[in-house]
Amino acid sequence: MLSMDRPQYVNWIVREDGVVFEDQQPLNCYRLSYVRDDAILDDWALHIRKQYVPDGELEEDAALNKLTVEEYLRQYIIPQKGEPFGPTARSNDISEILFADLFEFILNYEVPRCKQHNRSGKNESEHGTDIIAYRFFAEGKAPHKKCSYRFKKRRG
């Protein structure tokens, strides 16, 4: 599971008050309220890239494939807009990353980060749960290291 540092762009995430559903049920809504800042955008881009491949593996993997880091990322890791399913995969990935960041850095949930890492193809979205977020209500609680649960939906 990847551990993420808080990206600078999350300071742009603001809550919108007064949003209600058609039955007058209040909704928790958030939006990006941003000012163009290249340093923050660069930090955000790096944050997104780290969802796919950790820094410690990137240079080694590129070298093993006899590619520059940029070539390796484009050819094998990051969905590209000119490829079949590339735009859809990019859009889905960024949406999942945005929601994971909202849950982790704004709402203070624990969010495992592994969906984009080691998937079967850069333009293929893995099937299953998009985001898992959890929180312990008692201070100092942690999951037992010898206990894990797996839930799987099966047909028929």
Residue positions per predicted region:
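Mixed-charge (Asp/Glu-Lys/Arg
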Residues: 1-127, 132-156
